[in-house]
Curated annotation (Swiss-Prot):
Disulfide bonds: none annotated. This is 3-deoxy-manno-octulosonate cytidylyltransferase. Belongs to the KdsB family. Activates KDO (a required 8-carbon sugar) for incorporation into bacterial lipopolysaccharide in Gram-negative bacteria.
Length: 251
């Protein structure tokens, strides 16, 4: 995305207090700061546009606000991060100035700012509705693991795939690379509006993968190929790993 478009980019970070494996994780301490603040810092370092955190708990609201970041309260009833960021979008940009919405998950405290920027690149092609990220799988166990979502895609360049399907199964069959989907999205505003209006689709329910809703509706998702998968913090062990990574960076 060129610099001329940066005024039209809004980065939204959904944060939810309820977590089965790591309750209250947005406020988990990482190097003296709540995890959600660390994520907001990485998003700000990407320097692609306005950053807003969408929360569902006053404690998270206060922590983000105290750190100097823009924050908006959203419903605790949302079933997905996409629904949460859409509510936030309506509240923080009712005039519709933002043309591109980047959804950065609130549990990625170690994400490289360049990785955030990369999600926007597929939208340079006006035929693309949603940009996302992927990386080649180099671990044999990951190729068959259902928690590793695979992108079945057709190459459109050396660094980009057109997403044809997303699955927890091992796919595609045969020789060649397999790609791990990274759940960071950049939407055209109209695409996000359409996406949330559709409701869950048949394949989305079957695979438990929200992005299939877009594909079933005929929307185009392209995935930029990046070098590494950012650490998602879902367990106490993940949290300790994130602390080690950021401690080493600030060293």
């Amino acid at each position: 995305m060129s610099d001329s478009n940066l005024d039209g980019v809004l980065v939204l970070i959904p944060a939810r207090m309820a977590s089965t494996r790591l309750p209250g994780k947005p406020l988990a301490d990482i190097c003296g700061l709540p995890m959600i603040v660390q994520v907001a810092m990485r998003a700000q370092e990407a320097a692609i546009g306005r950053v807003v955190v969408a929360v569902d708990d006053i404690r998270v609201f206060d922590a983000v606000s105290a750190a100097g970041f823009e924050v908006v309260m959203t419903s605790s009833d949302h079933q997905s991060g996409s629904d949460r960021i859409f509510e936030a979008l309506q509240k923080v940009d009712p005039a519709g100035k933002a043309e591109f919405i980047v959804n950065v998950q609130g549990d990625l405290p170690t994400i490289d700012p360049e990785t955030v920027r990369a999600a926007l690149r597929p939208l340079e092609n006006e035929a693309v509705d949603i940009g996302t990220l992927t990386t080649e799988i180099d671990n044999e166990e990951d190729k068959t693991a259902p928690h590793i979502v695979k992108v079945v895609g057709s190459p459109v360049s050396d660094t980009r795939l057109r997403g044809l399907y997303f699955t927890r199964a091992t796919a595609p069959y045969g020789k060649g690379p397999l790609y791990h989907h990274i759940g960071l999205y950049a939407y055209r505003r109209a695409a996000l509006e359409r996406f949330v209006s559709l409701g869950p689709s048949t394949l989305e329910r079957r695979e438990a993968l929200e992005q299939l809703r877009a594909l079933e509706a005929g929307m185009r998702i392209d995935a930029e190929i990046v070098d590494t998968v950012p650490l998602g913090v879902d367990t106490p062990a993940d949290l300790e790993k994130a602390r080690r990574i950021l401690s080493a960076r600030t060293g």
